[in-house]
From Swiss-Prot:
Cofactor(s) in the UniProt record: [4Fe-4S] cluster
EC number: 2.8.1.8
Catalyzed reactions: [[Fe-S] cluster scaffold protein carrying a second [4Fe-4S](2+) cluster] + N(6)-octanoyl-L-lysyl-[protein] + 2 oxidized [2Fe-2S]-[ferredoxin] + 2 S-adenosyl-L-methionine + 4 H(+) = [[Fe-S] cluster scaffold protein] + N(6)-[(R)-dihydrolipoyl]-L-lysyl-[protein] + 4 Fe(3+) + 2 hydrogen sulfide + 2 5'-deoxyadenosine + 2 L-methionine + 2 reduced [2Fe-2S]-[ferredoxin]
UniProtKB keywords: 4Fe-4S, Cytoplasm, Iron, Iron-sulfur, Metal-binding, S-adenosyl-L-methionine, Transferase
UniProt domain Radical SAM core: residue ranges: 83-300
Ligand binding ([4Fe-4S] cluster 2): 97, 101, 104
Gene designation: lipA
EC category name: transferase
Cell compartments where the protein resides: Cytoplasm
Protein name: Lipoyl synthase
Pfam families: LIAS_N (PF16881), Radical_SAM (PF04055)
Species name: Methylobacillus flagellatus (strain ATCC 51484 / DSM 6875 / VKM B-1610 / KT)
GO cellular component, one term: cytoplasm
PROSITE patterns: RADICAL_SAM
């Protein structure tokens, strides 16, 4: 468990390119998290140790091309399986986020300007890896006038130029205060799957997603879908932050009301004692029931399980949702 209390935090003085991680990152959020003994992980929470030639090869290629993956930066539990299988979710716009979400292990700080060479590096690297499906995500960039939307477009275009047959899924931030501008910019190079995660239920937004707005996230998915009805829209949630089953079902209904067609539900795992605590471990049986309920609501695809993450087996998810490749 971890004790959580509210507090007033003075604004920090930031230096561009300097990362705040773990305890330092959490020291300035409005919610104070006091580390306490963690819940014991149940037997169904199992992670593969990342140790294979393919795993090491992918890490080397990423470093040589100055690229980042959310798999590494967010300490994803599936990194060993995905890297060993030759897949990765690329994180553009640097590895420093402008927000301090206390469930997330990505570093906070004042980011450096976008790397103008990143789109070309990304396109070349993905072609070198001979990928057929790729997921591109980013940190939040509240410092940019378009939230990073143009950089997404540049990266999508470069990837397709190097790999004409590839399918591209993007996992975007909420473009806070820039939603209309970002959606307009994305028209220049729409992805094959549009993903934006709600992360948790609206009651927990102040605690888990400070600076984000539940309705804004729903609007982002709906407005993009209106402009690109041929592109599946996708969202995901973490379970175990203190939500109820009925609240999860309510969010699923909201997603369907906003024409979202793909869903992922997975177990939240605390990255460190300084992050939000796990309040419960959802059983595989309950995840299976959520999946059944999602399909009954009209989702074309639902991936629900303890180790499911938004980009986990994203290529299989897209195929089952009707994306041809």
């Amino acid at each position: 468990m971890t004790e959580i209390t509210e507090r007033i935090v003075p604004p920090p003085r930031k230096v561009a390119g300097v990362k705040e991680s773990s305890a330092e990152k959490m020291a300035r959020i409005p919610i104070k998290i006091i580390p306490m003994p963690a819940m014991r992980k149940p037997e169904w929470i199992r992670m593969k140790v990342p140790d294979s030639a393919r795993f090491r090869e992918i890490k080397q290629v990423l470093r040589e091309n100055n690229l980042h993956t959310v798999c590494e930066e967010a300490s994803c539990p599936n990194i060993g399986e995905c890297f060993s299988g030759g897949t990765a979710t690329f994180m553009i716009l640097g590895d420093i986020c402008t927000r301090r979400c206390p469930f997330c292990d990505v570093s906070h700080g004042k980011p450096l300007p976008p790397d103008a060479n990143e789109p070309e590096n990304l396109g070349r690297t993905i072609a070198q890896m001979r990928l057929k499906y790729v997921v591109i995500t980013s940190v939040d960039r509240d410092d940019l006038r378009d939230g990073g939307a143009q950089h997404f477009v540049d990266c999508i275009a470069a990837v397709r130029a190097h790999s004409p047959q590839i399918k591209v899924e993007i996992l975007v931030p909420d473009f806070r205060g820039r939603l209309d501008r970002a959606i307009h910019i994305l028209k220049a190079a729409p992805p094959d799957v549009m993903n934006h995660n709600l992360e948790t239920v609206p009651r927990l937004y102040k605690e888990a997603r400070p600076g984000s707005d539940y309705q804004n996230s729903l609007d982002l998915l709906k407005e993009f879908g209106k402009l690109h009805p041929e592109v599946p829209t996708k969202s995901g949630l973490m379970l175990g932050l203190g939500e109820t089953d009925e609240e999860i079902l309510d969010v699923m209904r909201d997603l369907r009301a906003h024409n979202v067609t793909m869903l992922t539900l997975g177990q939240y795992l605390q990255p460190s004692p300084h992050h939000l605590p796990v309040k419960r471990f959802v059983t595989p049986q309950r995840f299976a029931e959520f999946e059944r309920q999602a399909l009954a609501m009209g989702f074309t695809h639902a991936a629900c399980g303890p180790m499911v993450r938004s980009s986990y087996h994203a290529d299989h998810q897209a195929q089952q949702a009707g994306v041809n490749f």
